[in-house]
Amino acid sequence: MTDHDLTLTDDPTANRQALEQLLTTATGGTLRLPAGTFTLDRGVVLGSGWTLRGAAHGDGPVTTWLTSSSPDGEPVVHVLGSRVTIQDIGFLPPPCAPGEHGGDRGTAITIGNYLYPAETEWIEDVQIRRVEVERRDERAANCVAVMGAVRDITISDVSIVGGCTGVAVHWGAVGDGVDSIVGPSYHPHHLSIRDLRVSDAFEGFYLSSVHDVVVDRVHLSDVEIGFRLLPGDNTDRFHSGGDNPVGARIRVSGAHVGWNGPLYAVRIAGWGRSEIDQTVRVLEYRDVVVRDCTFVPLPLARAGTGDPQRSRSPIVVEQASGVILEAIRVDLRVDPTATGPRHDDQAEVPAHQPAGQR
């Protein structure tokens, strides 16, 4: 693999073309970006075998920042290949309002896709390390999205300020739209999220219709919702994973959540209502554990949003049999500076289990 040192300027079109010239003509390697803040006129796609790396910054904050001037809602970086690494880069995504089913749009980084025109190959072995995302005062679009046919993904030491959901992990499927899915469906798995920090966002992270996932050492502060474990609106209706059932082998540990929304810090739901025919299905969770977590209710971020007839709940569980809650702490002292709980260094992503082409 070849290393490439890129020169970027204040010309958004030239910057994007410099990246694309290498990404479309070479067969992989490392693209090293200089320190500074650089604008692209639209997002770029990373295919297989590429590392996108910012300038060295020691133990301090990142010194390379990318943004986009595009109003079209594509990710700043869209990963559509395997063996990809993105590290030591900050992202400033432009404002975007992708709508209820546009969770993979308007992001800093999206890995994979939500909807596919036909059966697809898996994207695997992707690492996101030492990345920062800022979209202050803007909560309509997600920051990092992991979608569909993706597996063996590592997200570590990521810091996010603002946005809708910090890290959104969502199933995908073959279909023209959410109400016309024909399957098969694809469910992210063998995913590790560690040392994630999200603040001033609507939500820290969610996992929708996944299996074999470890989340450890996360600090979510000033968020309306901490995190959600969801079955997906079609649960496993279009899934044919054999020994890899959806909703199996999920660990969330070492989470500190300071939430300022009117409802809950955490929601764990087993039921989903299909957008295709409105039928309700219930997913059976297997070997799912949430442990060693602390939840701190903060004053409401928006006055008047709470229902005086309905109390705020640290955890809401809805038809989610098979889930274990262990060593859960609720801190009513309202101290957002408190350190997180002890973490679980023994939690590991299970060994790869082939899911086959679904």
Predicted regions and their residues:
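Acidic Gly/Asp/Thr-rich repetitive segments characteristic of extracellular carbohydrate-active
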Residues: D3-R32
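Glycine-rich phosphate-binding "P-loop"
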Residues: H4-P12, A168-G183
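Leucine-rich repeat
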Residues: N15, L19, A141-N142, D277, ...
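Extracellular beta-strand-rich solenoid/capping regions of secreted or surface-exposed proteins
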Residues: E20-T27, F38-R53, P61-D88, L92-I123, ...
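Short glycine/acidic-rich loop motifs that flank beta-strands on beta-rich extracellular proteins
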Residues: L40-G43, P61-T63, S69-P75, P95-G102, ...
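Right-handed parallel beta-helix
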Residues: G49-A55, S82-P93, E121-R135, V150-C164, ...
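Leucine-rich solenoid repeat scaffolds
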Residues: R310-R358
